[in-house]
Amino acid sequence: MPGGAALGWILLGGLVLRLWSIKHGLPYVYNVDEEQHFVPHAVNMVGGSLNPHYFENPPALTYLLAAVFKLRFHAGFPFGSSGIERSFLRDPTAVFTSARVVVALLGTLGVGLIYWAGARFYDRRVGLVAAVLMACAFLPVFYSKQALNDAVTLVPLTVALVMCLAVYERARWWEWAIAGAAIGVAVDVKYTAGAMVVVLAIAAFGRLIEKRLTWRQLLTGGAISVAALVVAVIVLNPYALVDFSLFKHQVLNQAGTAGSSGKIGQSSQPGWIYYIWTLTWGLGWLPLIAAAAGAVLAVWADRVRGLMLVAFPILLWLFLGGQARHFGRWYMPAYPAITVLASYAAVRAADAVPLSWVPRRRTALVVAAGALLAVQGLWTSVRVDSVLAHTDTRTLTRQWIEHNVPPGSGLVVEPAVFPARFLKVGSPKHSYRLYPIKPPFQAYEKHLTPALIDTYRQQGYCYVLVASYQHDRGLNAGFKGARDYYRALAAQSQVVARFSPYRFGARPVRFNFDLSYNFLPRAYMRPGPLLELHKLNGCQ
């Protein structure tokens, strides 16, 4: 099959995987980060100020979504007001679906750019294998279904990677400029992408060492790249300067939180081991092994070119591994380089087979190598896509409560499990009374004691909804108060409804901040936590 046609089929397949179950959970958004970080700020921008007033994550995706919402819903200038804010509060389905489709399309664009990167660093065969791997890899597919910046970051990062190679090969002024601008755009999508400047430095100094660049040319080109980077950062994040005190406060606060305090119930593994483990399922076992081999082969064959691919994944791994909090998606910016390295190793392995066959047989070996690299990702992506197609346990729980618990009843709902306003149905007079849980919600499990149950009963909060997301975190952390609370609750109540995400007969999945939210383990039949609704004994 010609390369262009093959790439077209790969892109189509990658898009299908990313659009499958794209409306999962809606009209409710169960991923807390997706619910809070980008889409609500973009909606506010449509008819208001372009200042996001939020810098914990950079705003490039927010601005893009705001522009899409303007065009999609004919809202804000120059269309006039269309009440997008009110309709978003009533039913956010259309807005979140639009945002997710944008991310899915950008994720698919990333697949095409991975082909470009593989072809530019080596040849078209490496590019096609890399594209297949990225099209199917579980973590890029999964986060292309969320209105988050993780999959989006791969687009400017891959462009930056290729343009750094162009600087190493030719070092024309516009290549310096595009490399710097691409890094700047990547930083405005995800701050950790800034480490890509090291790859640009490797390209520049590699050319200098090979005496294909003078110091004057290096300084001139470097100045062009830095200027382009700064311009890109300012254009896509102008209020970082206008509202610098807020920008500085939020970024430093976020960095301090991620670097100094782990999440309650988090794995005790060192971060460096944790991120290697995430590659075994986020990308796949064979791709991980192939990437390690590819790193050695690439550096051996061409030191500078190989280091350009190896440097960013290693730097990001060292930095993230030293943080207190660990999430598999945080390491996704390293996936483009890792994918190219794995594909390079696969093609080298196919070429090493001593065959005197016609070239078509050799091509078949490359196809087989690519299929082997991609099969784990394809299998897990298809399986999780089918899981997401089922109704979430939280939606089932809400439906049961609406039909079986009288309006006005008092409910205790554990925090950070349901979206805002999830159980506030009907008019205020007929909605449920929710027990006021004081923030910070991340410390909820620390403050649990059996005495709370008497408080619930005295104040008429007769129903207590327990979610495995909170329950398991408290027990994993070893909090005695949480353990005693859940034991007392079980002894002083009856479970009136139970909604499980697991297949019949499957063992519950041990809580993990990745696997419990991406539903990768085979035990899952539907998305969501295990939920139990307790009715307190002797409560009126």
Predicted region positions:
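Membrane-interface transmembrane helices that cradle and orient dolichyl/undecaprenyl
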Residues: 1, 119-121, 125, 160-176, ...
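Start-transfer (signal-anchor) and selected internal transmembrane alpha helices
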Residues: 1-20, 109-112, 119-121, 128-129, ...
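Transmembrane-helix motifs of polytopic, lipid-linked glycan transferases
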Residues: 89-93, 97, 101-122, 159, ...
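Transmembrane-lumen/periplasm boundary regions of multi-pass, lipid-linked membrane glycan transferases
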Residues: 17-20, 41, 63-64, 185, ...
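Hydrophobic/aromatic-rich transmembrane helices and adjacent perimembrane loops
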Residues: 143-144, 150-153, 186, 191, ...
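Catalytic lumenal/periplasmic loop and adjoining terminal transmembrane helix
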Residues: 19, 23, 27, 239-241, ...
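Signature aromatic-anchored transmembrane alpha helix within multi-pass, membrane-resident enzymes
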Residues: 8, 198, 223-227, 231, ...
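Short helix- or helix-capping micro-motifs
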Residues: 11-17, 130-135, 162, 183, ...
